[in-house]
Curated annotation (Swiss-Prot):
Keywords: Cytoplasm, Metal-binding, Zinc. Binds 1 zinc ion. GO terms for molecular function: zinc ion binding. Signal peptide: none annotated. Its cofactor is Zn(2+). The active site is at 65. It comes from the Bacteria. One of its GO terms (biological process) is response to stress. This is Protein SprT-like. It is found in: Cytoplasm. One of its GO terms (cellular component) is cytoplasm.
Length: 145
């Protein structure tokens, strides 16, 4: 079953309305579950949401995007702030927010030699340039083993 067919099935089952456009996987999405494009009506979905959270949560993400889709084409408020959107989302039991990823986002761990303060960073820092914010001691990178 293709993604577009799956979205069509969810649309008919949960909304009772057909989905007439295309749905695509978008690997570039990092923090969002999906996107609706009013200009041409297509939907993008994050494939990691299905892999990490399973089919049940992904179906709720599809419902969320279909709320945007159906409200837009009905000429009603389709933004997150609109009452029509909030009511329809609650009615179909869709997700308002995407669950956070279980993967650790910190790649580099540093600690102060003097006071032991621990720092976690996504990006490397120049140890010759930066010092501890508490005691101005020298920082060392901890091994990731």
């Amino acid at each position: 079953m293709t993604l577009t067919n799956y979205v069509q099935e969810v649309s008919l089952a949960d909304f009772g309305k057909p989905f007439h456009h295309k749905a695509y996987w978008n690997k570039r999405l990092k923090t969002t579950g999906g996107r609706f494009f009013p200009k041409d009506g297509h939907l993008d979905f994050n494939p990691r949401m299905l892999e990490e959270n399973g089919e049940l949560i992904f179906r709720k993400i599809v419902r969320h995007e279909l709320c945007h889709y159906h409200l837009y084409f009905e000429g009603r408020g389709y933004h997150h702030k609109d009452r029509d959107f909030k009511d329809l989302l609650a009615q179909v039991n869709g997700l308002r927010y995407v669950p956070t990823s279980s993967k650790s986002k910190t790649n580099h761990h540093y600690s102060c030699q003097t006071c032991g303060q621990v720092y976690q960073r996504k990006r490397r820092i120049n140890l010759a340039k930066y010092v501890c914010g508490n005691c101005h001691g020298k920082l060392i990178e901890k091994n990731q083993s």
